[in-house]
C-alpha cells in the first residue's frame, strides 16, 4: 500500500512538472518557437479547436514562424485567433501560409516575463508540495490504522521526501533555463 501511494504521488508530481514545462513554453522569449501557440484556440466551424490540430508549424529562422493550415478555408479563422491571442502576434496572411515575425523583447518586457516565469515555477512547486502533503497524510493513516508498520511508514516518508526534492529540483532547473533564455539578448 505504501508503494502504491508513492507511485501515485510520483505520477502526480511528474504531471505537475509537465504542466510547468508547458507553461514555460508558452512564454515568449524573443525567439520563434511553436510552443508559443500551444494554447491558442481557433473558432473552427463553431467549436474552439487547438491550433496545432489545424496547422503545421515551421521555424525557418530565429524570428519567424510559418503556420501552414491543413485546410485552407481555416486560414482567416487562424489569423483572427492569432491576432486575438495574448501572445501578441502580428500575423501576415499570403493566402497559403501565415507568417509571424517575432519582435525583439525590450529589457522591461524581459524582466516582466521573468517575474511571470518565477510565479509559474512557484505555483508548480506549491502543487508538488501539496501532492507530498496528501501522500504523507495517506502514509500516516496507513500506519495509524495498522496497515503498515512504523518503520515502513518512516521509510515511505523518506522516499516521499526524496521524490519531492527531485521534482522541486527539476522545476528549479527548468526555471533557471527559462530565465537564462529570457535574459539572453
UniProtKB/Swiss-Prot annotation:
GO terms for biological process: translational termination. Pfam families: RRF. It is found in: Cytoplasm. Signal peptide: none annotated. InterPro entries: Ribosome_recyc_fac, Ribosome_recyc_fac_dom, RRF_sf. Keywords: Cytoplasm, Protein biosynthesis. GO terms for molecular function: ribosomal large subunit binding. The keyword Electron transport does not apply. GO terms for cellular component: cytoplasm. Responsible for the release of ribosomes from messenger RNA at the termination of protein biosynthesis. May increase the efficiency of translation by recycling ribosomes from one round of translation to another. Belongs to the RRF family. This is Ribosome-recycling factor. The lineage of its organism: Bacteria, Bacillati, Actinomycetota, Actinomycetes, Micrococcales. The gene is frr.
Amino acid at each position: 500500500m505504501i508503494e502504491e501511494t508513492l507511485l501515485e504521488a510520483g505520477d502526480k508530481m511528474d504531471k505537475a512538472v509537465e504542466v510547468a514545462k508547458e507553461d514555460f513554453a508558452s512564454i515568449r522569449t524573443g525567439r520563434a518557437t511553436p510552443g508559443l501557440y500551444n494554447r491558442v484556440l481557433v473558432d473552427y466551424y463553431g467549436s474552439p479547436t487547438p491550433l496545432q490540430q489545424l496547422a503545421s508549424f515551421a521555424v525557418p529562422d530565429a524570428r519567424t514562424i510559418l503556420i501552414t493550415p491543413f485546410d485552407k478555408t481555416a486560414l482567416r479563422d487562424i489569423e483572427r485567433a492569432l491576432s486575438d491571442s495574448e501572445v501578441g502576434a502580428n500575423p501576415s496572411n499570403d493566402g497559403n501560409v501565415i507568417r509571424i515575425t517575432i519582435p525583439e523583447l525590450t529589457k522591461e518586457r524581459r524582466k516582466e516575463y521573468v517575474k511571470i516565469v518565477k510565479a509559474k515555477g512557484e505555483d508548480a512547486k506549491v502543487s508538488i508540495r501539496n501532492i507530498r502533503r496528501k501522500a504523507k497524510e495517506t502514509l500516516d493513516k496507513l500506519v495509524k490504522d495498522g496497515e503498515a508498520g512504523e518503520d515502513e511508514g518512516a521509510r515511505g516518508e523518506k522516499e516521499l521526501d526524496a521524490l519531492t526534492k527531485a521534482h522541486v529540483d527539476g522545476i528549479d532547473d527548468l526555471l533557471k533555463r527559462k530565465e537564462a533564455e529570457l535574459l539572453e539578448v
